[in-house]
Amino acid sequence: MQHDDRLIVALDFPTLEQAKACVVELGDAVSYYKVGMELYYAVGSEIIRFLKEQGKHVFLDLKLQDIPNTVAHALTVLSDLGADMMNVHAVGGKKMMAEAVKAVHEAAEAAGRPAPKLIAVTILTSMDNEQFADLNYKNTIA
């Protein structure tokens, strides 16, 4: 079965064993997996190593947000683990996002590999207009 890189399967499991079982069951049908906070915080980089050993792509969905220097250093470490795509939370600001981009590109260049994709989350999909208004933004969710 041929896989489609546009499909990213979320490994929203609390244990490494459950995540591995899902990857094994899906086999060659899926090549891209999302590792979120629950799994990454539970098992750390072991899940990334496993996925890379299986020849899979990794979207590390941690929505990093902190001072620019902290995010840049964290992304350098995560880039070196082999994540193919990562994200930051845009509310961290332009400077944080610019430092994030610079960090992943510098880490990739130093390691002689392509830079991972870096995307910014602007708003969580779970928010409604009432929750959005609580943040004191002037607009509504469109």
Predicted regions and their residues:
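Conserved anion-binding
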Residues: 3-4, 70-142
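Active-site beta->alpha loop and helix N-cap motifs at the rims of alpha/beta catalytic domains
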Residues: 41-42, 67-70
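N-terminal beta-alpha supersecondary unit
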Residues: 29-42
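Hydrophobic faces of well-ordered beta-strands that scaffold small-molecule active sites
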Residues: 5-11, 33-35, 58-62, 86-88, ...
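N-terminal amphipathic alpha-helix/helix-capping segment at the start of soluble metabolic enzymes
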Residues: 1-21, 109-115
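Active-site cofactor/substrate anionic-group-binding motifs, chiefly glycine-
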Residues: 34-37, 48-67
